[in-house]
């Protein structure tokens, strides 16, 4: 597991922050605004209603970030592992050569080889220490700790429990 984000990502950040991938909220405009302001802009792939729409979103995001006056922070699709679209969405992310992906709702194992094959870092949502250990064993580069008080799919652990482990 990676111990820190690589320089080609951190040098583009103003804050070490991910704008959360919020279901039915995070879209192209929010992601672009976050990235242009130096934070990682994340969005659930499910917010695009089809893989074709996801392809359009990524094309639009990448074009708008490339046109930005300063080098923008990366976008970070949130790939839902138990989605019926997972394989098609994963192929779309690979075609677009995304730099970061958050996997959620299941093990990242099915996505890690393809994403690592394009040099993409894989962050895995985890709600328990057991999930964290499984994600690390599956090849995740980092963890997104779903702790008590987090929005959306929350865990029940205090965030410090992960730190102690």
Question: Model-derived features: where do they sit?
Answer:
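Active-site entrance/lid segments in N-terminal catalytic domains of soluble metabolic enzymes
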Residues: 1-165
